[in-house]
Design a protein with these regions (language model features):
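Non-heme Fe(II) oxygenase metal-center motifs and adjacent flexible, charged/small-residue loops
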Residues: 6, 14-16, 25-28, 32, ...
Length: 304
């Protein structure tokens, strides 16, 4: 079998076969038929086959990333791939700790495989349209300021989010972000109905210290934050009513990685503020999806 033909044959098998033993037979035939140079090339292909098979021999969600096949729409590929991730899968998690009370935060190091997170980042860079004009500013210290990042929101019908003097309307879900919302909701065991999407172009973009305590938020719901792109520091600080400086023991910092998720309990959100400070050494884009559960109807006392 000519080397080019075998390569094509292996690629076809990679796309359509779930039988690892069949692929192994081709591997054995290759070791007898080709020189060392091609065998090294074959080993690379075969190792990629192994990496993209799960324990049942079925191709993983990343198969479209290896194919380089652009015959299908990127959005459809992303929706299918995100939807294949099981909320019951084994995720590497880290429970963050503090000496202070009311701190319940879980860090999921990677809910999205790297290549899938790469594709999601590229998709967002091409397709997400961020707010401009009045929706891209906040009212602080008695004057309006431009938001030091880009943002937009999606969610269920008739939802909006008020903060810092502005009212952010929720645009309808698109298929990709809805698929991500469904996955995050299953992992967090919370029916999120709103997402705020923030784009930080580099380490000069940031979000200041704050708590998510707006009246529209369901006070019993956690908040889930998914990151794609540049790794950035995320800092929790114990909230004090008298605004006295927090000691070192009252601060918790974690670097949020590409494809990760941070799950913040409602109790933590009440007693701790959080921020994403400037980091001038960070040169690349980070996009963050902050999933929330909003009240479908405000109480009378919340409508002012």
């Amino acid at each position: 079998m000519h080397s080019n033909k075998l390569t094509v044959h292996l690629n076809e098998m990679l796309m359509c076969s779930s039988d690892l033993s069949q692929i192994t037979c081709v591997a054995c035939a290759a070791t007898c038929s080709f020189n060392d140079y091609f065998f090294r090339k074959f080993e690379l292909i075969f190792s990629r086959i192994h990496m993209n098979l799960n324990f049942s021999g079925i191709l993983s969600m990343d198969k479209f990333l290896m194919r380089g096949d652009e015959s299908e729409d990127d959005a459809t590929l992303l929706v299918n791939s995100i939807s294949q991730i099981s909320a019951d899968a084994f995720f590497v998690t880290q429970k963050l700790h503090s000496n202070n009370d009311h701190f319940d935060v879980i860090y999921y190091k990677q809910i999205l495989p790297k290549k899938l997170a790469d594709r999601l980042l590229i998709y967002c860079e091409k397709n997400i349209k961020y707010f401009t004009g009045n929706l891209a500013r906040v009212f602080l210290f008695n004057q309006w300021h431009p938001i030091p990042r880009k943002q937009m929101a999606m969610g269920h019908p008739n939802l909006h989010y008020r903060f810092s003097g502005n009212v952010i309307p929720a645009k309808p879900w698109n298929a990709v972000i809805l698929a991500l919302r469904n996955l995050v909701s299953e992992i967090a065991k919370c029916d999120f109905n709103f997402v705020l999407i923030n784009r930080y172009k580099d380490g000069h973009d940031y979000i200041g210290e704050h708590r998510d305590n707006e009246k529209e938020l369901d006070p019993s719901s956690p908040i889930a934050s998914v990151t794609v792109g540049e790794k950035r520091d995320f800092i929790f600080k114990h909230y004090r009513v008298n605004h006295q400086p927090a000691s070192a023991s009252e601060k918790v910092c974690i670097a949020l990685e590409h494809g990760s998720m941070l799950l913040i309990s409602a109790d933590t959100n009440r007693h701790w503020s959080h921020s994403l400070p400037k980091r001038r050494h960070c040169q690349n884009v980070r996009i963050n999806f902050t999933f929330r559960k909003m009240k479908l109807q405000l109480n009378e006392e919340d409508k002012d």
